């Protein structure tokens, strides 16, 4: 495992991080949401993102094999099982999140349709041409070698298979001074970009099925998470440490400021392997 992967795993496996993402960020869904005017409900907005991505897969029949990389608590996988009857495998680095994922599956009677695997998406523990679809939400940014992730996705996808994912990214030519506090918080030298991921796609010979730029939602989401965290601070006393809350608020402020300064981007990308 790379040093960055080790740092990421330790962070998400910490008690504070687990409790924060479970209680504040969105429960089963811990990714950026789609907000409507006047709406600040994180869980509802996060589920809208899942629904928006899932509609792009309506042409795939029940029984389709889907791999979710960086799956978090597995909320997207359970949605796809229930609504699309897909056979889902969730791969994730955090063992704590994976345990919660398995518990959710047990409670909802989905264990036989939803396999949860401890693993790193830079080295997927699956044979070539195993999956019809690969799905990911706001996870690829954590890789120190994003092209390796794309190569692994290409390897495990069947011919004609599709990769659909969202990711927080940086704008081409982004102001380093504004971007740097965001990168330091997540221990990265850079983020991906629409251009970078399109270059990866071209290098692998994939078809572009559509890219949706939803950048304003990034600011909406981080602002909503910050407001929710501030509003529930007393409630979280004894659940999440004060030091973690203070650190998280500072980090969320950096994301909001960078988003407003137009150095960040977020969207949904959808590609097909030939």
Question: PLM features: residue spans?
Answer:
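Short alpha-helix
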Residues: 189-205
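Class I SAM-dependent methyltransferase SAM/SAH-binding core
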Residues: 65-68, 73-123
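N-terminal auxiliary segments of SAM/dcSAM-dependent transferases
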Residues: 1-21
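A short glycine-rich, Lys/Arg-flanked "PGG" loop and its adjoining helix->strand segment in the class I
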Residues: 147-162
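A short acidic, Gly/Pro-enriched loop at the edge of an enzyme's catalytic core
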Residues: 122-133
